[in-house]
């Protein structure tokens, strides 16, 4: 159940555990995670999906227009595989021209030689790259009814378990990212339905988080489905208000034989809430990695959100963009882009795998090289 006494705002103590990586939350558990995973092997999976919520005007900046958000997940992973887009309509970027955080993911998996796999949990546009199909579907606008059918939810959960088991046969830890435009709103809806305090807690892909739009849409959704905050368990809250990434990732965690690094920001809160409800929330086994832009975001509060759920470990990654020669990267420093495609967690995974040999300067240099290749092709 939500811990109301842990909902206060404010950034807690941060401790640098690796170059460019700081830990928050349970610092003792964080040190154990670093010790256990340092030098270990990993594979990164990016779970892609879509929700009709992303097409609500003003709710997501993960695309130049609301309609283009359906193309963003495919474009993100195509860029990581091929340095160009194929099935997507355009290079994923927000309306002010900042590049997709896929550039960070691409750079750090290159630097650390981390295998990268795409998992389709229900993307509207399928990517032109190899991917594992979990048989999902685009999440419905929860103001019009449950986001996912029982059949789809159950299939994503069970297939996720099988996948998690197979992916961790020969690695030391698993890294799981996501690309779901509109996902902070579905996450907010799930957490509200579970009874958590969510007002101004969730980050956004836009510079000025559209809290009023998100809160209005969530309120309309709960009213349409006759749900009061705290009415639902995690299963029903995710099925009725979530997106296809959520049951897929829960399943992957349950199937995993190793610790799991959740590469994402506030969108990972429903995953932690599900585990907490089942008595399975262990910060040494499941921990979160995100960018410093989420942790330091003045328009959201990931820490107070996670504190309500229970004990947690949160790693904050700095890609060094303040020193970039490209304006698009410096826009991250101004809050125009914060997270996506597992960017922050991917950097954490790279730092863990290499025992801290990859620094923010290395990340920035590789990001700029990747970005230049992308721009040469468009």
Curated annotation (Swiss-Prot):
Pfam families: DBI_PRT (PF02277). InterPro entries: Nict_dMeBzImd_PRibTrfase, Nict_dMeBzImd_PRibTrfase_arc, Nict_dMeBzImd_PRibTrfase_sf. Gene3D superfamilies: 3.40.50.10210. GO terms for molecular function: nicotinate-nucleotide-dimethylbenzimidazole phosphoribosyltransferase activity. Belongs to the UPF0284 family. HAMAP family: UPF0284. NCBIfam families: nicotinate mononucleotide-dependent phosphoribosyltransferase CobT (TIGR00303), PRK04447.1-5 (NF003372). This is UPF0284 protein MK0224. It comes from Methanopyrus kandleri (strain AV19 / DSM 6324 / JCM 9639 / NBRC 100938).
